[in-house]
Amino acid sequence: MFSMKKSLLLLFFLGTISLSLCEQERDAEEEEGSENGAEDIKINRVVKCSYRPGSPDSRCK
């Protein structure tokens, strides 16, 4: 019975560590995505404004 408790406790701790590592990796990917997303918006804004020079569109300012 004691060895079974040890095994379950070990599995619990390994699962907790694995979950923690996955969350850290996901957070890092989200941060990368938000940085790239901001740059994509800037590029998109430049492209739209270059097609309509002099347009009164507020996004082109």
UniProtKB/Swiss-Prot annotation:
Maturation propeptide residues: 23-45
Family named by the database record: Belongs to the frog skin active peptide (FSAP) family. Brevinin subfamily.
GO-annotated cellular components: extracellular region
Protein name (Swiss-Prot/TrEMBL): Odorranain-A6
Entry keyword GTP-binding: no
Keyword Cell membrane: no
Span of the signal peptide: 1-22
InterPro entries reported in the protein's UniProt record: Frog_antimicrobial_propeptide (IPR004275)
Compartments where located: Secreted
Keywords: Amphibian defense peptide, Secreted, Signal
GO biological process: defense response to Gram-negative bacterium; defense response to Gram-positive bacterium
Source superkingdom: Eukaryota
Tissue: Expressed by the skin glands.
